[in-house]
Amino acid sequence: MNSLNQHSSKIVCFARAEQNIAQILTDTRFAKISFRPHFKTHRSIAVAELFRKAGVGKITVASLAMAEYFAANGWNDILIAIPANPALATEYDELAGKIDLSLLVDSPDSLSLLLHTLKN
């Protein structure tokens, strides 16, 4: 899934990124919050590894393609932060058979269609 990075370039100061991650994870205001960072902006396994190294195990992404990309790189608890498309139920189900995949729904009809289709 290299296509996720075709349209952007990034310059990342890894030392600063590590400091920012550590600051959030040690901030007492967030002590009782389950931290699930959104990986839409960086779309980078290298940056994702900074989060993993800091103990983060759950992530949020913006599409099925991004979920597949990060799942293929060892992330196994992923939330897709857009409403699920029932037309992609087969693809969601395949991925959910490999990882802990969470989906959002925005209507009772979508929920019903997904519940009747998804097995995992």
Model-predicted regions and their roles:
Residues 12-13, 35-36, 55:
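A generic structural signal for short
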Residues 11-14, 18, 108:
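Non-membrane alpha-helical structural segments and their capping/turn regions in soluble enzymes
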Residues 16-47:
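N-terminal glycine-rich anion-binding loops that anchor highly charged ligand groups
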Residues 38-120:
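Active-site-proximal beta-alpha core segment in soluble small-molecule metabolic enzymes
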Residues 1-12:
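Generic N-terminal amphipathic, Lys/Arg-enriched alpha-helix
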